[in-house]
Amino acid sequence: MSNYDFLKPRKRKKSLFVVEGEHEKDVLVYLLLKVFPEIDIAEEDVVIFRSNIYSLYDAIEKEYGEDWDEIGVDLVYLMNKQGRYEFDFEDVNFNNIVLMFDYERQDPKFSEEKLCRMQRYFSDSTDVGKLFINYPMVEAYQDFSGWPDASFEQVEVTCDFHIVQEYKVRVKDTMVAKMVDLPNVIGRTLKNRYHMSQIERRSRCTEALLQLRPEEVTEVVLTSVLSHFMSEEKVKSARYQMLSLLKLSEHWKENLTYYEYMRLLFKDIIKHNIYKACSIVGGSYQVESSMLHGKYFDLNLLEVLECQNEMCRKVKKGMIKVLNTGVFFVTDYNISLIG
């Protein structure tokens, strides 16, 4: 019997994300919520656990005992007790709970049994929560050499600790990574070159620039936008600097706003990761558009994990297929968002 049966059941109305680190919250989830505004999730409901999945497992076992998956786990209660998320227990209700963590086979606490237990238990975001594991890490969604990238099906990385550390550095040079980083590049330029020290002002200026459609941009338009945030003297230099940054971006070449382009890009990223997950469990990477929805709902993330474990277990060539399942929270929320 659970020690928490006396607690009144909560009517679930909100969404809660439990993620491993800053990149998941401040970059990936933030951007996905931005480009898919149909997803009704508040940024403040994304909780950074600040440790890996094995530490979360230990916290669950400490709170609920070895038979935690038979007793039942209340993640909202656990996050609140650990001081990760503060709310009025009686008033805040959740209808969607998502966990997003890295595979991290190189961790000293790594255990296939523990991972499989977690994946098996956390399988429903509308109930106890749904676990999305990224292989080898969250940055896997950036691992595309160009777009489209037919080679993604074969992209893999060794399970060796040092190579995994190098992986994060390698993906920083990809097209997707550069697109994701564009708002930061603009923000840093505004701060360092034009001394825009106030974070809120810098953020609003960056946002205004990213909302511009290339065909509408003239010297007059750029001057008008920038003049809201800096002196006339700085505008003269900044408009050329900002225009040069924007022109180098992929969205500019496609005559789209930044967020229009990123929405299309993430739709394709999600689809390619669905294709790859299907191929990992023995299916075909080539999935017809008309069959995509059915293939996704037939996908078993525990089976994906077991296949990845088996590949990594090989002594001579322990490899793991690069895969980001974290982006699947979009399709879980509403698969029609990806077309």
Model-derived segments and their meaning:
Residues 16-18:
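Conserved beta-strand elements of the Class I
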